[in-house]
């Protein structure tokens, strides 16, 4: 079969047998052109299938024994051979023929049956010979049957399983396993090892004998109820809390029942004894004194809810049971609220206000305010001696000028090292000369003679002359000496003094 020549060219380029890169044109990219000719060409290039190899394989399989052929196709020894099936069928037929021959001995038809058996056997032999002559046909038919049969069975099996599942879902009856079983009895008891038990078989746990508190077998229940009603009946002599009437329900008075047991279940004797000990019969809690309450609260602060330690160390006049009973009564009283506020005992309760929605912020604010109230205030720092001396030297009374800035703050004071390096600060260039530019003028151009006429400045100069020896070691403040040899304040100090007091007229007088 000759291959058709493909010489037609595609829009992107020529489609020949030579390999080349496919270069799509602009039209193909714009219009999303899909050229499927390449797939067809590849299929044509593969060529037609070679049937000669398949024929050779079939011929080789025809000469192959049946067991090798089955193993080749994945069928093991589980597949039954046709010869075995035929042999089993022959044996079954022979068995049936033997039974028929035994039954027909008296009928005289044995000869005919034998002839039929011979014919049947001859026919079967012919069939076996024909099957042996054509092994390929029998194998092919057998393979087809064996391949098709399990598929059909599997299909029907799956359908049957689905049907069974659907039926089970519809008719599902829950089992009884989900019910809880009460594990009571000898079979559910744990086996305790011998080494764990601390007592022997006949050994007592404690020395004292057991005391019987109640035995329900002596008196019937109705008589016990009548006895409890008589025991709780009022005599009319009660006072205070005891005079409060009780409900109509029957109280299980353990003390009265215990008295009945001690009286050998004699109800009259038990009632007579209960009248002499009314408090014990009604189990009324005696009143605690103020000292006992105070000691109990101190014990709660010290030991918490360890009532054994509270009774042993703080409240020795009461038993542990009385302390526990008093604790639950005390917790419902106003005394507990006051105790909780003082000692923060128990859980903290927050009052809910209708105007507050975010209680977390309120809690944080309360904790911050509590922390700030507990924190000690910082001690007042002592004023620097140099600052106080400089304030005295400047003679300023007010601490702020018109702009609200301190006139002479601590930041303006210079150290010794800074003074030595920096020198004098004037309007002109900086120099190390401590004298003014002119004998009668200061650094700002004012005459020093007129400045000394001011009574305030005169007072300051007198004070500076007296403290000259003491302040010679402090070069933070510059001293300026006029032509007369007297000390005059600096221009910056005088200007600050004038501005702070608003005396600009003095500046005009000094200019004159």
Swiss-Prot record:
Transcriptional repressor regulating the expression of a number of genes including SP1 target genes. Probably functions through recruitment of HDAC1 a histone deacetylase involved in chromatin silencing. GO terms for biological process: chromatin remodeling; negative regulation of transcription by RNA polymerase II; positive regulation of canonical NF-kappaB signal transduction; regulation of DNA-templated transcription. Residues 283-335 form the SANT domain. The modification Phosphotyrosine is found at residue 155. Interacts with HDAC1. Part of a complex containing at least CDYL, MIER1, MIER2, HDAC1 and HDAC2. Residues 129-144, 396-409, 482-494 have a biased composition (Polar residues). The keyword Transcription regulation applies. Ubiquitously expressed, but at very low levels. However, consistent level of expression are observed in heart, testis, thyroid, ovary and adrenal gland. Transcripts are up-regulated in breast carcinoma cell lines and tumor. The gene is MIER1. Residues 180-278 form the ELM2 domain. Residues 180-284 are annotated as: Interaction with HDAC1. The modification Phosphothreonine is found at residue 448. This is Mesoderm induction early response protein 1. Pfam families: ELM2, MIER1_3_C, Myb_DNA-binding. Residues 17-36, 414-423, 462-475 have a biased composition (Basic and acidic residues). GO terms for molecular function: histone deacetylase binding; transcription corepressor activity. One of its GO terms (cellular component) is nucleus. Keywords: Cytoplasm, Isopeptide bond, Nucleus, Phosphoprotein, Repressor, Transcription, Transcription regulation, Ubl conjugation. Residues 1-63, 75-173, 366-512 are annotated as: Disordered. It comes from the Eukaryota. There is a cross-link at residues 239, 420 (Glycyl lysine isopeptide (Lys-Gly) (interchain with G-Cter in SUMO2)). Residues 37-46, 83-105, 160-173 have a biased composition (Acidic residues). The modification Phosphoserine is found at residues 10, 141, 160, 166, 367, 369, 377, 483, 488, 491. The lineage of its organism: Eukaryota, Metazoa, Chordata, Craniata, Vertebrata. Residues 1-16 have a biased composition (Low complexity).
